Amino acid sequence: MLFRSRLGVPVEDFGALARLYELENLRITGVFSHLCVADSLTQEDRYYTKKQLERFYCAVDWLRANGYNPGRIHIQASEGILNLPPQPCGYARAGIALYGTAGNVGDGLRPVLSLRTRVACVRTLAAGERAGYGLAFRAERETRLAVLTIGYADGLPRSLTENGGRVLIQGQFCLMVGRMCMDQLFVDVTGLLSVHSGDIATLIGQDGSRELRVEELAQQCGTIPNELLSRLGTRLNQVIC
């Protein structure tokens, strides 16, 4: 069984570790590794994680026994924090968990990030009329479409509108339709006659008693929350509450 990281030193190559400490212009202040399947609770993956931990601490012990100071050690990222007991390390790398998610809705975390935009305008289409690039949306009946001021240039996956993406407006779920544009997208607000320009639309977060979680968006796009949240662009205004 091999335990090789993307960029690090093979754990069994103690000589390479020693040579790093002997570099004149390098001051090592810490040693770390990364658990590649800490998000999985299958028996096979739990065993793999256990062996990774054992190998890591073996390398740390070797350094200490041979007079090399490993400094601060760390190996747990968010999933490792949630799925493993506390480790004898100096740090834990809580990344995605700081947003209140780590990939599973049932992990007990409370989301702290919301993504909202506004309605630019509302258009009424007659039955048979089309809207958007490629004329991708066709109104089967008289339909009210709200145009939202957010698009794929802000980091949203373009596939979201094609895979059942939703928003919350006035506490009600509204389906995304047509093709997402660079700066805008359409949602069907036919049943919400009071929706008008300036209304807030929630893509991630709560509106009234309903909620849209980033895990749902990720599942619809065939990806993970980490990717979606890291894609959110600098064009978005950030409000810290």
Indicate where each model-derived feature is located.
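Active-site loop/helix belt of alpha/beta enzymes
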Residues: 3-126, 193
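C-terminal accessory subdomain/extension
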Residues: 124-241
